[in-house]
Amino acid sequence: GGPGQELTLSYAISGKKAPGCVCLSIDSEGTDGTTKVAGGITDSTSYDAAEAKGINVFDALRGHACFEALDAIGDAVFTGNTGTNLCDLNIMYVPELPGKPRKGSRIRSVHARQIIDCKCRPMVEVDVITEDGSIGTAAAPTGSSVGMYESFVLRDNDPAEYNGLSVHKAVANVNDIIAPALIGMDAMDQAAIDRCMIELDGTENKTNLGGNAIYSVSVACYRAAAASCKRPLYDYIAGGRIKTVPIPSFNVLNGGMNAGIRQAFNEFIVMPYRASDIEQAVEIAVKVFNRLGTVIRAYTGAEPRVGGSYGWCAPSEDPEVCLDLIQKAIDDCGYSEQCAFALDCAMTEMYDREHKTYYLNGSQVTNDELVAYVKRLTEKYNFVFIEDMLDEDDWDGFVKAHREITRTYIIADDLTVSNPARIRRAYELKAIDGFILKPNQVGTITEALAAHKFASEHGMFSVTSGRSGGVVGDVVMDLAVGLQIPFIKNGCPRSGERIDKLNFLMRVKDNYPGCHMAKIDDIVRF
């Protein structure tokens, strides 16, 4: 550190470097305060100039850096006498660098076992251990409603164990087939690891080895790589400063068939998008959810029932009645100005393929009628987004909805299943504004990141979401923070894995001074 460091680094960069040498200048708390990247020379380009030109500084580093250089303090250049002391120096590690593996990050062992998810269904869990002793553990959640284009969940179909839901075959595939192929590979080369498993499987939807087997290994390797760098996974993903945590949204009312009432729409969601901070957003969710129980009791004259996703069961077939009850709970709590709605319609579950109609409010309707109905809802209520308002194969319906509904965002889940090819098709057809990012749907971290990258480069949203059969410590939270996603689906403020996600966001915010909850006031459409 010091006044001369930029000049020295500029000279070093312009000179002839030995193969594999990287020159980095990184300030932390110097006398002139915290700077970004060396005030900042990197690859002969200042940080501000790179930012103005749209150059990603971390991409610039990827072009020159190698693992050995970052491991060896002797490869760095230090000058000056008033800046950063050696003991304060922050060595910046850039993930997925080309070249040789970082010392110690090679995979030493891969081991799978059967555990149970938060709905007490068996799932695959995997431990990956690197040569330096770093451990990554991950499990594969599953949803209650699963799109037909998702990666295949391999189960044993043995009625004698968990009614056929056990996953011993998938566990064996990890231990006997995947593990031998990955041992010795670099845990930090995520793309190579995922490519290896996809090639071992040899099918489009990962039906041979099981998407649940492949996904668990993929995430475990991701975690092991971050652990090898001694960084939280979300920080490893971000590659830079964490500026925001996403706005959580809460599924407070569950649709489907409950207590004899068939509510077509699956999830009625509250988003406290104008909360002052993440702590207030969580408090709003808890208070509104609890108050909603009282409001439902007054409406029905009976105790509210708990739905399949732990929200309250919808007390009416009429979506407007449900929305009005939620709005009353919001108003009663004094949060009318802070909250908006979202909907997950999950209309694939309500689609009659033979007659090509949808069940809605006691009747069968065409996609034209469904689009017109939802459009009227968006004109009456404020929605941040509406998800899966049509069947997973109703491309024409989605195009029509996207064209005609302009007061909210049209988001897809079953239509896109986090698959880059399907997201590209939806973009080219102008069918959606964004998609729900559930990495286990597509089956590997690499494919999930590719889906997010395509969406962000083409002006679409990625909205991370857990699964109803969730896990504690879900990687979707690391992705949401690391990718700086503006808003997410969290589920209702009840049950351990959902509360864990909320606590995760509050911890991240607390650990990064200046970090705040994302703001979307300037992008909502109402």
Regions found by a protein language model. Give the residues of each.
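Metal- or metallocofactor-binding catalytic centers and their adjacent structured scaffolds
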Residues: 141-231, 282, 311
